[in-house]
Amino acid sequence: MGAVAVTEQAIVNEAHHRGMQVPNRPKRDDGENTAAAGAYVAFPKKGLHKWIGSMDLNSLYPSVIRALNMDPATIIGQIRPDISEARVHEDTTLKKKSFAGSWEGKFAVEEYDAVMEARKDVALTVDFENGNTEVVSGAELNKIIFDSNKPWMLSSNGTIFTTEHEGVIPGLLKRWYSERKELQAQLKKAKDAGNAIETEYWDKRQLVKKINLNSLYGAILNPGCRFFDKRIGQSTTLTGRTIVKHMSAEVNKVITGTYDHVGEAMIYGDTDSCYFSAYPTLKNDIDSGKIPWSKDNVITLYDQVCEAANTTFEKFMLQAFHCPKTRSEVIAAGREIVAESGLYITKKRYAALVIDNEGFRTDIDGKPGKVKAMGLDLRRSDTPVFMQEFLSELLLMVLTDKPV
């Protein structure tokens, strides 16, 4: 069975376990538009940067689906995407942009923005699952969702979900997440006991659960899946974009005082992570000796920055999506790497000299750290070994500021 078939059967089994009937596989129109906006990837601030930190959201897409209770049976309605589809059509036809290019720098559909800005001058058509259709202004819909005590949440795709009952898909993800935690606990026991065989066994078991968790989103966005629903797929990616934008802006605010996702402290953002540096903001105080600066101090500082940003998700989820605390608590992030330096070239192409990875020091045994390289083709199979070694050595010299 492929990943889609495995995921589909797991959802069917979960539904049957709840005593629910599963609908037959729907017939799909070959001409149906199934493309959905993908993950947010920022353009990096190109060049060599000093003292980099990164903050990473935990299991972003599974967590988004759980937080907003995304499931075909929990959809209340959909704001008709007339404005956003017209913009995409214009971009892809008249402006000759790709579909992905049309979503460059976008974090939500225009209809969602109209609701959040409480626009009185924008009329929105809402198609409800019960067959009703209503035309309301952005301001009116904002009041209905956020001020009327309805158990509704609004995704960045303009899809309205209920909190009255937990959907099958979020429930399945919750169970898988819990099972993975149990397997990771067994893995830790095996590691602590020094049992190599059991360590390998439990590591593979927890890895399978991780794959299950991360592949579910892709499966339900596959038109071949029985539970395919573009509204859920694009709700996941766009809501994820909105959350990552907030995380980046909040990290920048902690460091510089300005809420800006591309502010002075921000270097790069990719899917569920943001890369930042406090060094440019603090450089004068560091040079004057006002702020003590060492590897240990930087690690402590960046831990504090990420902890401060992480505390803001609960309030943000309520304000941005009307997501209650009981559901938003799954949205969490933590500090990932601290690097002494990093080279950023373009999207998906960068390298960093990591000195700490999630609390584990890598600058040990006389080593300056561990090089994390993405998209630089240092280890291509068609490149001779001596050239691979030369390129790796050259990159390390750049990152350690040694003469080339």
Which residues fall in each region the model found?
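Common nucleic-acid-contacting/processivity interface regions adjacent to the catalytic cores
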Residues: 1-79, 85, 89-97, 195-250, ...
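Intrinsically disordered or highly flexible coil/loop and linker segments, enriched in small
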Residues: 17-25, 66, 70-77, 182-193, ...
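Extended, highly charged clamp/arch subdomains and adjacent linkers
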Residues: 20, 24-52, 59, 63, ...
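Glycine- and acidic
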Residues: 41-50, 157-170, 185-202, 221-237, ...
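Phosphate/diphosphate-binding loops
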Residues: 91-132, 299-335
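C-terminal polymerase-core module
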Residues: 275-404
